Amino acid sequence: MSQWLAFATQLVGVRKSHQLALQFVDLLTQGLDLSDSLLLLPSSDGRLLVPHDPQRQFAWSVTDFDVPFAHVLQSSNAMHLTAEELVFWQSNRTFSQLTSRVGMFDSVWIQPLPMDTRQVHSILLLMGESHGIVSAFENADFLKFIEVFSQQWSLLNDMEREEQRRLELKQSLTDIERDSAQRSLANALSRTLIGESAAMQKLREQIVSAANSQLSVMVQGETGTGKELVAAAVHELSSRKSAPFVAINCAAIPEHLLESELFGYCKGAFSGADSDKQGLIAQANGGTLFLDEIGDMPLTLQAKLLRVLESRTFRPLGGKQELSSDFRLVSATHVNLLDQVRKKEFRQDLYYRLFQYPITLPRLAARLEDIELLSEHFVRVFNLQHNTRIRGLNYRAIDCLKQYDFPGNVRELKHLIEFGCAQTADGTQVEASCFAHRLQTLPCLAPEATPVAVSVETENVDLEPSVALAGEPNFAVIHDLKQAVSQFEALIISERLNRFAGDRAKAAKSLGIPKRTLAYKCLKLEIKTP
């Protein structure tokens, strides 16, 4: 068996294309005693020719006709350049440096591969003694060696492309399954975090995303929006769900007790410390620590918390040894922490440590479409707790609730529904009259108005100066209170829209209500914008 056929048998056993290229070039260099050899391959985007060996850091454009490779690609014909002919190919610096070692009796052979087709997949560059290279391409065994490489190269590339497609398909299916699982989790959350508004759907998606990460979560929202529910949901959907969820309200505990609650203490640490007590940080090991109203945490304690977050170690009060705790931190606040940072009331370094994954909860007034679902849920809960059969809310009661701004958000709605259910006979619906008198009148800017006391049969309601009409109204002509209130409200909104030339944003701001609420009232009261 000739040398080249022996070399060919070595190539057949290679199973990786990059290994095949390296071995092919090494065998060529060895068999022809070359000064240099390269296999040039197309880049991933097909715009460049790059060496088979990634350690050789150079490349040529496939359209750069200052080098012979572009001509070979275009013609699919080999090119043989002697030392004298290389003089005319010196404009490209990289090619000039590559061929600088070509001597008087040497030459450069540039061969497109495979040799028997115009479908070029690579270019072979050989540099060495001219007679030896030319003779090799007249040797049948050498040509068979080149053919074996080309066939093996095509086979391995086809197999690798197929494997890549299989992996991409598998990854695509994995992504689809993950997205489907996340959607399922988000849908499951709708039983706890109720609402079909866009804001609530986005919130549930954020919770699922946050749960899948290991980042510290900051839950922001007004009082009554459900911050602890969100924190608990992040824990329940995370990999730590089987470990403890430990919660503490930083605003509900005196400053001098908060540190001992968090860090725990050792016996004798202070007067009354008769035994060791494990702190909440230790209790949360493996699980989640929820710090509610973290904006009320004292500055001195903020520094200690930051150290715990950075080192994952802590020392109980009176303790001499550092202890470790692996916990996920979820914190919440209803205040603007960034303002507190500017006022030097909250540490900036802790602020950035807490805000790795911020989640902002929407106000109830910003998702009026969810009020009916929430109300039905609270009625069902009331029925279960009190063994009653309240049949939901009357549509007028729903309309009444949708006109209210809910400064106390979902918690206030819950209490209103419970109050209404308590006054409703079993088997009937909750009427608007059950809680309407508890709804605070929305403020209206009217500095010229004077206070007017309205007397009704059930109770006296003193209207604020800002919401009373100027002059003395004739209450004797009022026989439908709800209609009178609606007309009064329509007059105020119409006046304000006229004042601002139909600009609903300015009108809503002047009335102290969200633009969405104003739009709802205009639709309900059939108010036309000027």
From Swiss-Prot:
Keywords: ATP-binding, DNA-binding, Nucleotide-binding, Transcription, Transcription regulation. GO terms for cellular component: protein-DNA complex. The keyword Transcription regulation applies. Pfam families: HTH_8 (PF02954), Sigma54_activat (PF00158). GO terms for biological process: positive regulation of DNA-templated transcription. GO terms for molecular function: ATP binding; ATP hydrolysis activity; cis-regulatory region sequence-specific DNA binding; DNA-binding transcription activator activity. Residues 193-422 form the Sigma-54 factor interaction domain. The keyword ATP-binding applies. InterPro entries: AAA+_ATPase (IPR003593), Homeodomain-like_sf (IPR009057), HTH_Fis (IPR002197), P-loop_NTPase (IPR027417), Sigma_54_int (IPR002078), Sigma_54_int_dom_ATP-bd_1 (IPR025662), Sigma_54_int_dom_ATP-bd_2 (IPR025943), Sigma_54_int_dom_CS (IPR025944). Transcriptional regulator of the type VI secretion system. This is Transcriptional regulator VasH. The lineage of its organism: Bacteria, Pseudomonadati, Pseudomonadota, Gammaproteobacteria, Vibrionales.
